[in-house]
Amino acid sequence: MPFELPDNLHPDCGPVAWLLGRWGGRGHGDYPTIEGFQYGQELVFTHDGRPFFHYFARAWIVDDAGEKVREAAQEAGFLRCKPEGRVELLLTHNTGFAEVWYGEAADGKLELTTDAVVRTESAKEYTGGKRLYGNVEGDLLYAYDMAAMGQPLQPHLWARLVRQ
């Protein structure tokens, strides 16, 4: 699906403009403390001309046939665009934590690392992560590495999403 830059795009958001829109697809997840799984996911990036994007994502567990089994994670926040491809990401999650991420974007790639994590009393232990988003052949590929439940930083989620 072709993508056109919006007329009111803030100049600082140029390096991440390719993310704008709705994306959907399937991914895989694994971690030492859980059984491997497949999931469906939808990501939405919107903007209003100011130097940030609003972000929302939801996921659901799927079976081997791709049929929805149950709802899974949701996250929402703001991707704040700074000069020279620097970005800040503020996220809140339905699982009881909030994060501050810092990173850089260039050449169809966005790399982020957590700077701070805040958890509610009932949230599982989670200490940080790394995210990599890439524009590959017009699709959105991403990988998410996580440190949680006493485990060191390691791969947790990866997916290929297409523009909807």
Swiss-Prot record:
EC number of the protein: 5.99.-.-
Pathway: Nitrogen metabolism
Entry note: cofactor: Binds 1 heme b group per subunit, that coordinates a highly solvent-exposed Fe(III) atom.
InterPro entries: Calycin, Nb(III)_bact/plant, Nitrobindin, THAP4-like_heme-bd
Span of the annotated motif GXWXGXG: 21-27
Protein's UniProt keywords contain Isomerase: yes
Keyword Nucleus: no
A molecular-function term among this protein's GO annotations: metal ion binding
Enzymatic class: isomerase
Catalytic activity: peroxynitrite = nitrate
Cofactor dependence: heme b
Keywords attached to this entry: Heme, Iron, Isomerase, Metal-binding
Residues reported in the UniProt entry to bind heme b: K130, H156
Database matches in HAMAP family: nitrobindin
Domain notes: Forms a 10-stranded antiparallel beta-barrel structure able to accommodate a hydrophobic ligand in its interior. In fact, this fold hosts the heme group, which is located in a wide surface cleft.
Assigned protein family: Belongs to the nitrobindin family.
Binding partners and assembly: Homodimer.
PANTHER family with a match to the protein in the record: PEROXYNITRITE ISOMERASE THAP4 (PTHR15854:SF4), THAP4 PROTEIN (PTHR15854)
Its biological purpose: Heme-binding protein able to scavenge peroxynitrite and to protect free L-tyrosine against peroxynitrite-mediated nitration, by acting as a peroxynitrite isomerase that converts peroxynitrite to nitrate. Therefore, this protein likely plays a role in peroxynitrite sensing and in the detoxification of reactive nitrogen and oxygen species (RNS and ROS, respectively). Is able to bind nitric oxide (NO) in vitro, but may act as a sensor of peroxynitrite levels in vivo.
Entry protein name: Peroxynitrite isomerase
